[in-house]
Amino acid sequence: MIFKPQSFLKAIVLSMTITFAFNMSAPIASAYPIFAQQNYENPREANGRIVCANCHLAQKPVELEVPQAVLPDTVFEAIIQIPYDTQVKQVLANGKKGDLNVGMVLILPEGFELAPADRIPEEMKKKVGNLYYQPYSPDKKNILVVGPVPGKQYSEMVVPLLSPDPATNKNVSYLKYPIYVGGNRGRGQVYPDGSKSNNTVYNSPVSGTITEILKLEGKKGGYTISITKADGVVLTEKIPGGPEVIVKEGQAIIADQPLTNNPNVGGFGQKDVEVVLQNPVRIQGLLAFFACILLAQILLVVKKKQFEKVQLAEMNF
């Protein structure tokens, strides 16, 4: 099914439902890209970085394929690939292990937008599947988001797009335009308020000695680690369920030394490509030029044959 303007609310509700299913007790930060929509007017910062990187700290690859050139008012497809090892498991919000989910944001040039359902070929609809692509906001139809969705099923996404027509949209010209994509797999390491999730490494805030490691009971688990400083002050660091403690009682540590491993197996990546909005008149002119060249070549060959016949006749005479 493909998103329609009148289905905007339905798409949001569905996306939030999927988010809840994959992150049952997680704060909104893990519900990418919804939290970006709520906190940023534009997902691409002035320096070119896509805001998803603020919470997904690990760098991973992402691929984007589009045609080299498209004609105006034409439906074409963009293929996004978010590769990862589907055998690995991530730490969920409840501290348990589960499959990774993926999400992406596609930033199109002004005038480009999601293709209407009635203009998408049946073959392309099959490639899209049941993904709902929704605008980043009501006034930014050229920015599309989706996710989180199951990574095993949607590590490759096909987005049906509609190119603008400069004849009807005076803000668009026949030029080369950039397209940006950001794609992530797995949960983030930081929440919007700056606090850590349970999908990251925890470091010691001070230097001292580990005096106690207490395992917490409950559904989410976790630990409390007591660190005694040189002046005798005891500081307690709480570790949520998910990361594994890698220090021992009696161990001397320094500030910023890791107390846990880094459980994160996901990451975020971004890429940009270019697409040319091609003027049909230019193509027609180019074809006409090639036709003239071909005709000239044919005439030259014919003329050469005639000349050779005349020479041969004169020699025989």
From Swiss-Prot:
Heme binds at residues 32, 52, 55-56. It is found in: Plastid, Chloroplast thylakoid membrane. It holds the Pfam family Apocytochr_F_C. GO terms for molecular function: electron transfer activity; heme binding; iron ion binding. The keyword Transport applies. Binds 1 heme group covalently. Its main location: plastid. The keyword Membrane applies. GO terms for biological process: photosynthesis. Keywords: Chloroplast, Electron transport, Heme, Iron, Membrane, Metal-binding, Photosynthesis, Plastid, Signal, Thylakoid, Transmembrane, Transmembrane helix, Transport. It comes from the Eukaryota. Residues 1-31 form the signal peptide. It is a single-pass membrane protein. SUPFAM superfamilies: Cytochrome f subunit of the cytochrome b6f complex, transmembrane anchor, Cytochrome f, large domain, Rudiment single hybrid motif. The chain crosses the membrane at residues 280-302. Its cofactor is heme. GO terms for cellular component: chloroplast thylakoid membrane. Belongs to the cytochrome f family. Component of the cytochrome b6-f complex, which mediates electron transfer between photosystem II (PSII) and photosystem I (PSI), cyclic electron flow around PSI, and state transitions. The 4 large subunits of the cytochrome b6-f complex are cytochrome b6, subunit IV (17 kDa polypeptide, petD), cytochrome f and the Rieske protein, while the 4 small subunits are PetG, PetL, PetM and PetN. The complex functions as a dimer. This is Cytochrome f. The gene is petA.
